[in-house]
From Swiss-Prot:
Residues 133-218, 264-349 form the RRM domain. Residues 405-415 have a biased composition (Polar residues). This is 17S U2 SnRNP complex component HTATSF1. It comes from Pongo abelii (Sumatran orangutan). The modification N-acetylserine is found at S2. The gene is HTATSF1. One of its GO terms (molecular function) is RNA binding. Component of the 17S U2 SnRNP complex, a ribonucleoprotein complex that contains small nuclear RNA (snRNA) U2 and a number of specific proteins. Within the 17S U2 SnRNP complex, interacts (via UHM region) directly with SF3B1. Component of a complex which is at least composed of HTATSF1/Tat-SF1, the P-TEFb complex components CDK9 and CCNT1, RNA polymerase II, SUPT5H, and NCL/nucleolin. Interacts with GTF2F2/RAP30 and POLR2A. Interacts with TCERG1/CA150. Interacts with (poly-ADP-ribosylated) RPA1; promoting HTATSF1 recruitment to DNA damage sites. There is a cross-link at K429, K430 (Glycyl lysine isopeptide (Lys-Gly) (interchain with G-Cter in SUMO2)).
Length: 754
């Protein structure tokens, strides 16, 4: 064998030639060797000839004619598909015909014995009975249609569909002219449907025609042509999915024109502006939630998007059905949301409303975020408060309600601010009075009281007057709140009966004496000249008023009640000096008559009403008074009757026109004085009187604004008494110039009026 590369045929021929030259003797020896039995190839296992392949560098069995025949018999060989190499082998066999025939192995005549696969013979097919789902129906009316036949046969089972055309597998046979013959074929999906149709539909009648149903049998008509290409259904998966779809319980879609998928998406514009989210990014979530709540009324929402960077303020809402989207468009188009008129329309299916953030915007956003992180904690809190206030100042855009008027939020904000303004002055007044009471406890001297009087006027008088004159409702609300808190205090009576009463009595006496000395130097002998009150007199009167206020504030800080201080002082005076109290009561009657006369000039009927109410309240309280103090009360009543006459003469000298009301006021005053002795153990009654007094002087303030400068001093005194209304009864007794010892009567008068 040469070392050149030969192709397969040349190489095979070369091997045959070499076999002729060198292999005849060996073959003869192998065949004539009787010592061993031949194997299946006709050769001894140990006598198999090998040859060396120079190209592959290996030994291979030597190819002989017997080897080729055996190989063809084992691995299948047909005469029609003989290869050229086999032809060459035949040529070699012709050339070696002189060899004995026994050397040739017999060629196999039956290929099946050698392991060749048997191919299925092409011919007519037969359907197995257990898999046959076809039903043949005869006796149908000649005018029956395919739809009517489908409707008839579908009553007994699911009709199979063609996987490619998706049409029902039914057939109505026709003759040569195209007319219906009256028979048809139906293919069911399950075998059970065939049995059901045989039981129920067989021998049934339709329009007078009797039907006959049987299992379909397929027969060959004519001769079978095997040359025709056999139809193959390779779409097994498609067929299986079609069957599963038919077996599904879900109903089929409604027949009708199908709408596009993008018609289910609604585009809403002008919902917001991108700048709205810079101050408060959380507004985005609020708008999304409001839109979700509103759109859920029209149907099921599948998806909701807000394009926060779009300049038109675009939002998209995806519904389940196009009809729901149509309803949403019809309802929301043209409505108002957050002060903006929105528009709603169906999505065209192509427009992309997503606006990407530019590199510049991204850099600015990152810089702002970095600045926020580097800022101290205090500035962060300030920025948060600024953002909250900015969101409150946003106005109509923050309403975020459909079809809402833009000014609603502003009105609500104004109401809130007004309510806060009403409450703030009241709290400030209480706080200042408490501070003043604490300062007065440190030093109860007259000089200290006078020094602190300008400060107290600035703190108490000015804010109280401004709040009461500018907004009367505010003072009324404040007094009501104080009344409620005082009336609801059950601890006041127990505190008054405590051992602290002795020390408080002494303190009150010292204060009253100091006030009396100060008032003697400040009194003006000309009592009738009320119009000529000088600035010195006004300042002195203010000082005396402030001293009484400080006495009341001292009592408030000590006991938490506004009447206990003065009542304790009154009790001390009655116990220690009976005659001195009678003198003070006479002067008190005069002062009360002055109040009555001036009230009559001002045409203030509120005082009468309040005094009557006080009388009725005190009548109820008299039933619960202790019997041990009745004697003192009777003595006081007789003294008051004698003092009433003196008060009347004093009022006539001043030219006041209150004679018609003196008797009524005197009766009310008698009741007031009778109660003063009994109120030592019942301070709860004083709280109710205090509430009535506050209402009285608030009415006086509203009436005093209408008069001349002649009554300005009285107005000021009345306003001061209003400021002290929560602290001490009838503060109006300090009007005008007072007689000697009037400052002492101020404090005792407040006690008697309780």
């Amino acid at each position: 064998m040469s070392g050149t590369n030969l192709d397969g045929n040349d190489e095979f021929d070369e091997q045959l030639r070499m076999q002729e030259l060198y292999g005849d003797g060996k073959d003869g020896d192998t065949q004539t060797d009787a010592g061993g039995e031949p194997d299946s190839l006709g050769q001894q296992p140990t006598d198999t000839p090998y040859e060396w392949d120079l190209d592959k560098k290996a030994w291979f069995p030597k190819i002989t004619e017997d080897f080729i025949a055996t190989y063809q018999a084992n691995y299948g060989f047909s005469n029609d598909g003989a290869s050229s190499s086999t032809a060459n082998v035949e040529d070699v066999h012709a050339r070696t015909a002189e060899e004995p025939p026994q050397e040739k192995a017999p060629e196999p005549t039956d290929p099946r014995k050698k392991g060749e696969k048997r191919k299925a013979e092409s011919g007519w097919f037969h359907v197995e009975e257990d898999r046959n789902t076809n039903v043949y129906v005869s006796g149908l009316p000649p005018d029956i249609t395919v739809d009517e036949f489908i409707q008839l046969m579908s009553k007994f089972g699911i009709i199979m569909r063609d996987p490619q055309t998706e049409e029902f597998k039914v057939k109505l046979y026709k003759d040569n002219q195209g007319n219906l013959k009256g028979d048809g074929l139906c293919c069911y999906l399950k075998r059970e449907s065939v049995e059901l149709a045989l039981k129920l539909l067989d021998e049934d009648e339709i329009r007078g025609y009797k039907l006959h149903v049987e299992v379909a049998k397929f027969q060959l008509k004519g001769e079978y042509d095997a040359s025709k290409k056999k139809k193959k259904c390779k779409d097994y998966k498609k067929k299986l999915s079609m069957q599963q779809k038919q077996l599904d319980w879900r109903p089929e879609r409604r027949a009708g024109p199908s709408r596009m998928r993008h018609e289910r998406v609604v585009i809403i514009k002008n919902m917001f502006h991108p700048m709205d989210f810079e101050d408060d990014p959380l507004v985005l979530n609020e708008i999304r939630e409001d839109l979700r709540v509103e759109c859920s009324k029209f149907g099921q929402i599948r998806k909701l998007l807000l394009f926060d960077r779009h300049p038109d303020g675009v939002a998209s809402v995806s519904f389940r059905d196009p009809e729901e989207a149509d309803y949403c468009i019809q309802t929301l188009d043209g409505r108002w949301f957050g002060g903006r008129q929105i528009t709603a329309q169906a999505w065209d299916g192509t427009t992309d409303y997503q606006v990407e953030e530019t590199s510049r915007e991204r850099e600015e956003r990152l810089r702002g975020w970095e600045a926020f992180l580097n800022a101290p904690e205090a500035n962060r809190g300030l920025r948060r408060s600024d953002s909250v206030s900015a969101s409150e100042r946003a106005g109509p855009s923050r309403a975020r309600h459909f079809s809402e008027h833009p000014s609603t939020s502003k009105m609500n904000a104004q109401e809130t601010a007004t309510g806060m303004a009403f409450e703030e002055p009241i709290d400030e007044k209480k706080f200042e009075k408490t501070e003043d009471g604490g300062e007065f406890e440190e030093g109860a001297s007259e000089n200290n009281a006078k020094e602190s009087s300008p400060e107290k006027e600035a703190e108490e008088g000015c804010p109280g007057k401004e709040s009461e004159e500018g907004c009367p409702k505010r003072g009324f609300e404040g007094s009501c709140s104080q009344k409620e808190s005082e009336e609801g205090n059950p601890l006041r009576g127990s505190e008054e009966g405590s051992p602290k009463k002795e020390s408080k009595k002494k303190t009150l006496r010292n204060d009253c004496e100091e006030n009396g000395f100060a008032k003697e130097s400040e009194d003006d002998p000309n009592k009738e000249s009320e119009e000529e009150v000088g600035p010195t007199k006004e300042s002195e009167e203010d000082d005396s008023e402030k001293e009484s206020d400080e006495d009341c504030s001292e009592k408030q800080s000590e006991d938490g009640s506004e009447r206990e201080f003065e009542e304790n002082g009154l009790e001390k005076d009655l116990d220690e000096e009976g005659s001195e109290k009678e003198l003070h009561e006479n002067v008190l009657d005069k002062e009360l008559e002055e109040n009555d006369s001036e009230n009559s000039e001002f045409e203030d009927d509120g005082s009468e009403k309040v005094l009557d109410e006080e009388g009725s309240e005190r009548e109820f309280d008299e039933d619960s008074d202790e019997k041990e103090e009745e004697e003192d009360t009777y003595e006081k009543v007789f003294d008051d009757e004698s003092n009433e006459k003196e008060d009347e003469e004093y009022a006539d000298e001043k030219g006041l026109e209150a004679a018609d009301k003196k008797e009524e006021e005197g009766d009310a005053d008698e009741k007031l004085f009778e109660e003063s002795d009994d109120k030592e153990d019942e301070d709860a009654d004083g709280k109710e009187v205090e509430d009535a007094d506050e209402k009285l002087f608030e009415d006086d303030d509203s009436n005093e604004k209408l008069f001349d400068e002649e009554e300005d001093s009285n107005e000021k005194l009345f306003d001061d008494s209003d400021e002290r209304g929560t602290l001490g009864g009838f503060g109006s007794v300090e009007e005008g110039p007072l007689s000697t010892g009037s400052s002492f009567i101020l404090s005792s008068d407040d006690d008697d009026d309780i």
